[in-house]
Amino acid sequence: MAKKRVDKRGTRKPITKIKFLVEGITEKFYFKELLKFKEYSAHLDIDDIGGGGYFAFTREISKNKSLYDIVVIIADLDRAVIHFGEKEKLVELISLLEKLNIKNNIFLTYKNIETWQAATLPYKINDLSLELGYSGKSKGKEDIFQRLMDKGAEFEIGKRKFKLENLYYIKQGLEKGKFKEGNISKTQSNLIYFFEYLRDVLEAKIK
């Protein structure tokens, strides 16, 4: 007599899905491969907004908020310094993220993502595109993560080159973040606690 099949699907722990939103295609290529490398593939859902500034993130989240559980944004901070009105739009974006879900977060780098990528190398460089062997700017290069790895880049190296006290916006836990206005144009990146935050979000018990 055949054994009765037991459906164990109901006992499986659901996988927490995080929606990652980045500015452009280069960031998408880089973080997609980085997250795979760090074994976050099960939680990987990443899209770029095609530029457009902080309001483009706000528009995307507002339009699709019913589809998103947790949203993590990765963006450049120099826009808030250079362009009139962008700082206010950034603050509005952060307020929206916190209002929708305290697990949401934004990771900002000044000047931009290339600043972070260059910092992950074990030596100082002047031109990231040139160092990685690109004939033009490094924008839109599908293999940028691998080229960085081939040069000895490590996420942990980048973490050591930025200071927590230099951050403009700090949100390390599941509570509202804090602003330090005087830091907005300092070289910085809160990617220094990126994976620690993801771990805490995935292990969190709060809804």
Indicate residue ranges for each PLM-predicted region.
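Short beta->alpha junction loops
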Residues: 44-53
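C-terminal accessory helical subdomains adjacent to catalytic cores in phosphodiester-
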Residues: 2-17, 28, 33-44, 58-72, ...
